[in-house]
Amino acid sequence: METLGLAEGVENALSASLLLSIPVWASLGAERFDRIEIPSRIKRLVLLADNDRAGRRAVTKALRSYALPEREIIVLWPAVPFNDWNDMLRAGGKVRLGWERNAA
């Protein structure tokens, strides 16, 4: 299954990619999080917004924008107490999901 992650900023995209072992694009801000053109071949989209008010709003919009009948959309948040994926990576955080090894 072709998988793609979407994070807000460049640093968070790189950090999430390292943590999850999947390709991650940056939207360059919460206000653009639902406006990225995701290729239709992406069957699993992982939304990786910041864990703050703007990030939660961005995810709500993105869920509507990116929905396709054949696409699975997963929302992941940085572990508490981290606000974003870069903070989590720098603190030595780890993520174990199960599907990350099969990601394209």
Each model region followed by its residue ranges:
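TOPRIM fold recognition
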Residues: 1-4, 10-104
